[in-house]
Structures are given as structure tokens and as C-alpha cells.
């Protein structure tokens, strides 16, 4: 009896198990077409046609289209638009995660890798491997306990002999960190640098993808939306690359409209809610009528019934129109999809040489469907009632950018136009006596909002010069509140905290090797999170010169790199710096001398980059009296929240002015006086039970002192 054992040969198809055929996906029209990138695809073909070192690796920043270049090459292979030596080749994308999954036993991983490489080698160049994120092959499969080799070392000998062809793709950073460290692996690949496309090239790529998006989302995308996506993404999303970021904007804007199309129109939804409210009221009144019959109530019920009938009739009519419009629109998209499928089959038949089937599609099927499409579009236009949006315009793209960045980019509504036109008046309600300064800042905001400012610089940069307490910081606060309805939209840096040279690290982050390197800088991180804001550098003259030097790049180019090398965009910020330099000259109305003091303290290149140097005037008596009235009104509002009724005697303003105002210290002593002399007195009397809620009080001046007089009123 023969007990010898003959092992069954392993017939597993490792390549199909752990990879995907890109050729099949192109044939099934699952891969988006690529327009452009001809130079990169030509270089890829040239490297693959070499005798040795015929393994290209695409290197570029994330989102520039490395994988799309490979898919574009495969499409050319499928269409026989490549040299003879590359015709009929099949490109498989290798799944590295699938390769390593379940390899718990020693030798299982090597078996899979060798099985794949054997299949590729035996194909005699007819199979090419594509490895996305190729840097991951370094160290993949290595086990320190078993001493197994990683996939990179298994590949090296076969790559060197030209037995297999591999296309790789990775980013510049990861190529440098992983592949370049292994010199033997690096020299087996030929680099193809994939740079970010220009705006015009990105627009061309997107125009090629437009039809695919329209068919997927069942809507129409205007060309103006594509242009807006490219321009806005380039300007407002600087930390990502074209065309990926522009594609994302169009995709999200389309998804937004698609969601709205799937939902009931707002007008029908509003009618339904109105009907529910009236039906509830009708049912309640009808129940009352049964208990106590009443002619007046009966008349009201009849009126409600009539309203309900009219609303239901309107709802049913609009619902029927909406469904009809939706059905017509869906039939258009169905025809478009059929035409696209026929175009794909036409290309396939032409490639295979089946000209009879190709001519039937070209001269009979496609013209027939195009004629049906034309009729369906005419029918849709005739029955259209604009109950739902079916188009993506630049406004939808702007809305997506606004949601992502917080920058208002939608077309100006009438209400916002009014707000901008009256911006100065709103700020002047808070900042008194500095009309020239307010106008300068407001004009800059208006230019920025209608995109007339230099797009490569911040919205505006100012130095506010003036003595303490004249409203420099208050103007910055009020600007943030009026523009963003929130004072917190202003990011404030007190420059007295940045008097040391090393404090630069606080703003942009600590350099490598120092404690806190992993943490982001206060300035750069704040602007990354809130790119549309007012930046206030309070008392800039107190900062160390090296701190002001880092602002040079911000003021000139609107960008700044943090310690991690990330580029932060300052182009949508308004930069305000306050200073007390030369305040004694400003008080004497000698502005030339104040400018000299500024020039002595700051370098010429710093001052030259500032848009406006704004002088704040000394507060006049009429202005101070207005400020006193404002402060007393604010105090009264706080008292009113506690249901306490107070009035202030007109003579009180003059008394506060004489008792507290000092030209040298500005308006701040006035606030301190009101807090100490009036607010404190009221607080004491509340605690003592003298002030109660059922009494109205008048704050007066009596014998050069503040006094509170009570008058009885009806509660």
C-alpha cells in the first residue's frame, strides 16, 4: 500500500483576490474620465516602455490627481491609444490591507506576495501592478520575532531584473520619509512629479467631469458654478490642492440641491402646517358648538371650513404640479443616462472592431434617444413651476464655502446691503467723537465685502494712534459686534505678553526640539479655526521687535507658516494694531511729531505695509457727555433686568464730567467714577432693603454728591 503524500497544487488566484482590475472598471464606466494631464500620462507610458527601471512612481501633494493619472492611462489602454508594447496590458490595483489580512501563520504573507508576483511574472508584461500609497510597502509584513522580510525587500530583486512592472503613487512627504531612506528601493523607481494644476487646467478637468455629476445627482450644473468652485477654492481653501478641493465644492453643492429635490417643496410644507393648525382650531370650536349652539360661532366655523377647503385645493394642485414636474425631470435624466451608456458601448465596439453594432448605436439608437430627450426637455420647460431647484449655480457653491470657512460669500441680500451702508452709523453709536477713524475702517470693510480689495492681502491693516481711553480698542470691539453680531469674533492679543524675544513661539508654535512643539501657535491656530475675523494687537509698541517682524509676511502676502510648516491664510482677516506712541503730540494736535515717534519705534518696512495709520482725536466735552449718557443707559439696562426703575437727572452728566474726566486718561476714569459713585451706592441700598421693585427712583446731584430719591408709584 502506497502511503506517500502528494500535495494538491494551490490554484488560488491571488491577484483577483487581493487586487482589482482597473481595466474592468473602465469598461464598466465606473471610472471618471480624465481631461488633460497629457504630459504626465505620456511620461508614464515612456517609463513603462523602458527596458530597465520601468517602474514609474507618481509623487505629488494630496488631491492633485495622482490616481486619476493612472486611471487616465488605463482608459487609453482600453481604447488602444497606447504604443503596441502596452496594448492588451491589464492594470491591477493591489490592496495592501487585503494582502496582510489574516496572515497569522508564519509564511502566509510571503506565500501571498510570491503568488501575486508569480502571476505577474508569468504574464510576460501583460499585467502591471498599481500600488497606491506605495510608501506603505516599506516594513509591511515584517515581523521582528520571525525575521520575515517586508514586501519592499521581496519586490527589489524582481524590479531590478525587470521581471515585473509596478506603478506607484505617494505624497512628497511620505516618499521622503520612507522610500528615499531605502536607496536600493528608490533607484528602482523613476519619479514623475505631479504638480498642482493651474486654475485653468483645473477648470478643464472639471468640465470633463460635469456630465458625470449631473447624471449622478440628477440636476444641471452651470459653467459659472465650475468657475466659482475653482476660484473660491483657490482663494479661500489654501491648505488643500486643486482639483480635489474644487471637486469637493461642486459635489457638496450638488448634494445639497439633490437633498432639497428629494424633500417636499417649502411652499407645500407651509400649506400643510397651516391646514393642520386650522383643522385643530376647527375641531376644538366644533366641540364647543355641540355644547352651546351659537350663531356667531357657527359663522366662524363656516369661515374656517371655507379657508380649509381653499387651502386643501391649493395644496392638492401644487402637489400634483410638483409630482408632474419631478416625473418630467426624472425622465430627462433617465434619457441622459441611457445616452451615456450607449456612448460607452459605442467606444467599446469601436475598440473591438465590431463596426456593425457601433454604426447601429451611432446612427440609429443615439439620434433616436436625443430626439426623445429634446421633446422631454421641451415638455419639462412648458410645465415648469419652479417648485424645486434643479440647477447648481455659483451662489450654491458660495454657500458651501461660507459654511466651511465662516466667510460670507453669498450674493449680498438687500438686508445686508442696508447693514453695510449703515455700518458707520451703528459703530458711531458706540464710538463717540472719532468719526474720521470710523469712516476709514468702514470704507475698507465695504471694499472687502464686494471683493474690490487686493485678494492677496488682508482685508485691511491699521495702526490706531491716540492717547489712552479715546476709543481705539472700543472701535475694534464694535466693528466685530456689528459685522459678526458677536464681540467674540474679535481675536485679541495683548502685546504686553510678548515683550520677550522667545514669545514669538507663542504666536506660531515652538520650533522642533522645544517643549510644546506638537502644540499649535495661538495666532496661527486662532486664524485657522476662524479665518474671517478682526485681529486686534493691543499696544503693539510693547511687543519685542522680532514679534512685529513675523507680521511683515502677514501684512504683505496675507499668509504665515506655523512651526509645523502649515500655511495659514490671513487674507480674510482685518488687522488692527493700537498704540499710545506720540499720544502727547496728538493731544497737542501735532500729528507730524506723532508720526516721527512712530517711525523711530518701528522699522520702515513695517510701517510701509500698513494700509492706514488712523489718528484718534482728543475727546471734546460734547463727546464726553455723550459717552456719559451711553454708560448711564447701559447701567439702566442692567437695573431694568432686575425690574428696578431708575431715571438719571440731566445735571448728573455735567457733575460726572467735572468730577472724573481728565484729557490725559480719556473716557476710562468716567466708567470708574460711575461704578464707584453710582453703581456702588445703588448696590448698597439694594442690600440694605432701601431700594425695592415697586418704587421708581431718580439719581440726582445733591450738595456735590450723588443721591437717590424715591417716588412712590403704583405697582
UniProtKB/Swiss-Prot annotation:
Residues 619-715 are annotated as: C-terminal. Residues 14-196 are annotated as: NBD1. Its main location: cytoplasm. Keywords: ATP-binding, Chaperone, Coiled coil, Cytoplasm, Nucleotide-binding, Repeat, Stress response. One of its GO terms (cellular component) is cytoplasm. ATP 1 binds at residues 60-67. The keyword Chaperone applies. GO terms for molecular function: ATP binding; ATP hydrolysis activity. CDD domains: AAA, RecA-like_ClpB_Hsp104-like. One of its GO terms (biological process) is cellular response to heat. It is found in: Cytoplasm. Residues 197-406 are annotated as: Linker. Residues 247-385 form a coiled coil. Pfam families: AAA, AAA_2, AAA_lid_9, ClpB_D2-small. It comes from the Bacteria. Homohexamer. The oligomerization is ATP-dependent. PANTHER family: ATP-DEPENDENT CLP PROTEASE, HEAT SHOCK PROTEIN 104. The N-terminal domain probably functions as a substrate-discriminating domain, recruiting aggregated proteins to the ClpB hexamer and/or stabilizing bound proteins. The NBD2 domain is responsible for oligomerization, whereas the NBD1 domain stabilizes the hexamer probably in an ATP-dependent manner. The movement of the coiled-coil domain is essential for ClpB ability to rescue proteins from an aggregated state, probably by pulling apart large aggregated proteins, which are bound between the coiled-coils motifs of adjacent ClpB subunits in the functional hexamer. Belongs to the ClpA/ClpB family. This is Chaperone protein ClpB. The gene is clpB.
